[in-house]
């Protein structure tokens, strides 16, 4: 049987198995493992087409998805019937595996499968806009609580209902306290229909779970609070199916620890030494030679072929180093990873805390150089923040690292408590703002400015480049109270400026000033000047403002008074930032102040299409400048002013 081919944007054809081919294979051999391997090829190609996604955990959990589908559908397995019972993945990283399982049953089309991480397509983490997805996930720890709610709702509608509610968790997710908070209540309520499966592949974002945050005997812990708790071989779908059937026959809620291998299905993805520091296949599309090798192995295995038939070597065609991080282009994170080392060398009171994101937040170099002043907290943001609070009370300067959305929303109460002690804790929130957008809104921090600016004494920063980053960390260390630094995931704006202030002019301009914070919108503002110049329009001035929340000083107000209008660009949805401050401080003046920013939930997709969707790309900013100046030229941007909101769209 030959796979189908999907044309990628790069011009290459990506192999995949259609739902009909998967159904044909099942009807011929009734081999769940074969169906799972067929879905692995679809996961691999969908991620390759998207350019990003989580391969390792999708491969480790693929057998579980297929086993659960068989458990819930029985004889209707892969018949195209909708999955009526409730099953969802709490960890969310395995969304490609979820989509592949839905596609295998005909619930998602081929085109939908290859719309992964595109605007209007399949979200990077599960959302209810997708057929077959019953709840939004991606923020860890909520799964069992959500499953309890579904089970209780079923009973309220039909007191005799005991339809299984199955939730898949990650073993790293077990770091989150909510998982363990949720378990006793399921026993108290007698919710025997709740079945939790743990994809226990042993590896978190960078390395082994027992090196990150050892969780002990989780089977014994679940059993101790009254759950039916068992283990099984998670990459054997028949064993998983047997464990599910055993759970169905037990009156207690069930906790199944499925022992899996991260990257299961590809020999060299499975190989990771005990002392390995960086698992190479946690996220991201593969280099083309690796993709071709992995696809060949999966294609030849499907239909009863030899696992390595047609594959020249069981070793990867490219050398992969499990002891070194992946190379990455210059970014705000790469700037910080060296700056953090410098800060810790100069100040022995600085302590770095990390939430299982040492590579993604740039703490990995400091971890090796200063192991005594590096604390790996795992995926336990509330614990990390409270620990930082008492470190600060004891005279140290804790620097708390996590993704901005998890840090600021999960640990808000702990952050507030620390602030009430007027202690100096510095929070660094990564992936801040609209971009990266492919992972979906669970990972896009657009509420963080509103949250952190409401904390008493909190200073909020967002540097646009290396010079401003140095200024921000100096300001934060000298500030006696708490500080929050948003760290964008895009390339820094290179300015070459030596003197950094709270308001920095990047480009000289005419009657309009664009004011922004951070690299994303500062760069779009700079590029909008090129768009305007190429069209013969006056170029606006561009200002970068690295501190978001403090009111403007008198000289800064005077600086902006020279312009006829000011447009504030905001990479968040807070009403408490620069547009609000300017509107308040200049209310008695005739200065026209406008805002281009976010409202509501951010869109999911590739960066360029998401920026355009929110009218925050260079073209939209240029059109807003021209429109407000009365110059016309096909306006499409949504512009907020003090008095009203204008929505301009191109007409034909």
Regions found by a protein language model. Name each.
Residues 171:
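Residue(s) in the substrate-gating loop at a strand-loop-helix junction
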Residues 167-168, 196-198, 352-354, 400, ...:
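Structural beta-sheet core signal
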Residues 174:
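Short active-site segment of divalent metal-dependent hydrolases/proteases
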Residues 1-166, 302-482, 486, 491-492, ...:
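Thiamine diphosphate
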